[in-house]
């Protein structure tokens, strides 16, 4: 019952976004609690796959992004750090940093 009371405002917002319900959800930035609520809505009883990283893990990953000293290219990340940044393809990168569709959200359902 508590889940429905949490999802009701999201459902009302989606209903008001546009005349076509299928288009109201396509290609949106979804971050934080909005992303979690959208996953609950899309996945329903199946649930969804989400393993958030602790703050310590995130800080350790960012520790590898060393900046170059003075001269040309100063302030740019080293190639290894750049390569690591390009390999990230999590739900936050897909739906919060970039935009994602309903179909991309379904990829995270169990």
UniProtKB/Swiss-Prot annotation:
Task: Name the Pfam families on file.
Answer: Insulin
Q: Which cysteines are joined by disulfide bonds?
A: 31-96, 43-109, 95-100
Keyword set, alphabetical order: Carbohydrate metabolism, Cleavage on pair of basic residues, Disulfide bond, Glucose metabolism, Hormone, Secreted, Signal
Q: Which residues does the propeptide include?
A: 57-87
Q: Which CDD domains match?
A: IlGF_insulin_like
Compartments where found: Secreted
List the GO terms this entry assigns under cellular component, sorted alphabetically.
Answer: extracellular space
List, in alphabetical order, the Gene Ontology terms for molecular function in this entry.
Answer: hormone activity; identical protein binding; insulin receptor binding; insulin-like growth factor receptor binding; protease binding
Q: Where is the signal peptide?
A: 1-24
State where it is primarily located.
secreted
Description of how the protein assembles with itself and partners: Heterodimer of a B chain and an A chain linked by two disulfide bonds.
Listed name of the protein: Insulin
Species of origin reads Ictidomys tridecemlineatus (Thirteen-lined ground squirrel)
């Amino acid at each position: 019952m508590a889940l429905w009371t949490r999802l009701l405002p999201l459902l009302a917002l989606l209903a008001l976004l546009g005349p076509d319900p299928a288009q109201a959800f396509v290609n949106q930035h979804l971050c934080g609690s909005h992303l979690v609520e959208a996953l609950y809505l899309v996945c329903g009883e199946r649930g969804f796959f989400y393993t958030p990283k602790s703050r310590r893990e995130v800080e350790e990953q960012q520790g590898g992004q060393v900046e170059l000293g003075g001269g040309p290219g100063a302030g740019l990340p080293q190639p290894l750090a750049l390569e690591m940044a390009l390999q990230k393809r999590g739900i936050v990168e897909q739906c919060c940093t970039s935009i994602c569709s309903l179909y991309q959200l379904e990829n995270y359902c169990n």
